[in-house]
Regions:
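Dual-mode signal for accessory low-complexity, basic/Gly-rich regions
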Residues: 281-400
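Active-site bordering "gate/hinge" segments
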Residues: 1-308, 313-316, 322-325, 361, ...
């Protein structure tokens, strides 16, 4: 099934089109982004049951205008027909005169007008089980059953925590040549356990995610056996001797490396600021010929899947590294204009009141052809790394 449209967007769209026409009387380019979203997070642990609103939920609008030299933005949370002139005047009188407030010795960087190809569509992602139809009570019951089943696997396990979070968001983007709507739902599931090892407490977790609905609860149950195995392995583990070893990375560790150690380094707004080493290595080998790296909302069906970004650029599948050679970075529209290149559909806002930055979407290495068992057999002594819990980017040095 497809995620349905937002009734609020349908209601507000005629008014927003009037606002766009009003802005275009003054500016050669204007765009409007409307976001309407909802979502919840469910957590079950020894401490109890928690149901909270998803932290990414928002409702709001942002207009962007071009005065022939630079861009300005104005965010607001409500609009009806009698507020159109007020918003237009606010943009004219308080947003676009921003350059006059700069110190005399500070120059304004001139930007061209954003290319505005014609696109008119409404697209939706697929799902099997709608969270609202399943209901809070049943979701909690299912999460509780996963927790109880995991706890029953081994009496040494002292805690199992299960969690599930979803978001359904709708976005409308309007410009002189664009009228695009997207309806997207993503879901994440997590199961975490604790087991004692002497006076220590060891932790392991597993997770699943996707562009879809509460069918993810079925996936969570399949994570119980590997989680219990990890916990038992940790309970009998010994500290390693510090040194250099051959290692094989589980997909979650590989994902952390591709995201932190390299992904942030090819966000091209950092090229504009000369804060990224990657700019100097375009066209050169930066990895093994076995490595091909992608980023893009259209590159996979996952939690960062969408049809257009927050600047109205269509979703893409960007090949960043092709058989070891660094081909390109990822870019928002503003940084692309500064660099004289094309945006890649990576302009993302934390919320409507924040500017769009270059940010990753679905970032990953292409799978190889070797079997894990053969890879392990090829190493005389080493370690299999899994359960990455955190990382830190280093665009200027490519450190890990």
């Amino acid at each position: 099934m497809k995620v349905t449209s937002s009734k609020l967007i349908e209601q507000k769209k005629p008014v927003l089109k009037q606002l766009l026409d009003r802005l275009l009387q003054t500016y050669s380019y204007a765009s409007i982004l409307m976001t309407d979203s909802k979502g919840k997070q469910y957590t079950i642990s020894k401490q109890g049951i928690s149901i909270t609103e998803n932290m990414f939920v928002e409702l709001g609008y942002v207009v962007k205008v071009y005065d022939g030299e630079s861009y300005g933005e104005y965010a607001f949370s409500h609009i009806d027909e009698n507020e159109i002139d007020t918003i237009a005047e606010e943009v004219k009188n308080h947003v676009m005169p921003w350059a006059k407030k700069l110190p005399d010795d500070m120059k304004v960087k001139q930007y061209p007008e954003i290319p505005d190809e014609a696109y008119h569509f409404e697209k939706s992602t697929d799902y099997e089980v709608l969270p609202e139809e399943l209901g809070d009570e049943e979701i909690v019951k299912r999460l509780g059953a996963v927790r109880e089943k995991a706890m029953a696997q081994d009496e040494k396990i002292v805690e199992i925590k299960t969690a599930c979070v979803y978001q359904i968001y709708h976005k409308l983007f309007l410009s002189p040549n664009k009228d695009m709507t997207q309806n997207v739902m993503w879901t994440n599931g997590m199961i975490m356990g604790l087991i004692p090892k002497g006076e220590e407490m060891k932790m392991a977790f597993d997770s699943c995610s996707g562009c879809g609905g509460m069918e993810i609860l079925d996936d969570m149950e399949t994570k119980i056996p590997p989680l219990v195995q990890k916990l038992n392995d940790l309970a009998t583990s010994e500290p390693i001797t510090p040194g250099e070893y051959d290692c094989i990375c589980a997909p979650d560790v590989t994902g952390m490396i591709v995201h932190e150690a390299f992904g942030h380094g090819v966000e091209m707004d950092m090229f504009v600021k000369k804060r990224a080493l990657a700019e100097k290595y375009i066209g050169e080998y930066v990895a093994s010929p076995l490595v091909t790296m992608h980023d893009g909302a259209a590159a996979a069906s996952e939690t960062a899947t969408f049809f257009f970004d927050d600047e109205g650029t269509l979703a893409q599948d960007t090949v960043i590294i092709d058989k070891g050679i660094l081909k390109t970075g990822i870019c928002d529209a503003q940084a692309a204009m500064a660099l004289g290149t094309k945006p890649t559909g990576n302009g993302r806002r934390e919320k409507n009141s924040h500017k769009a930055y270059t940010r990753m979407t679905n970032t990953f290495f292409e799978p190889g052809t070797d079997k894990v068992e053969d890879m392990i057999a090829s190493i005389s002594y080493g370690f299999y790394l899994e359960n990455a819990s955190s990382g830190m980017e280093d665009p200027k040095n490519w450190g890990i």
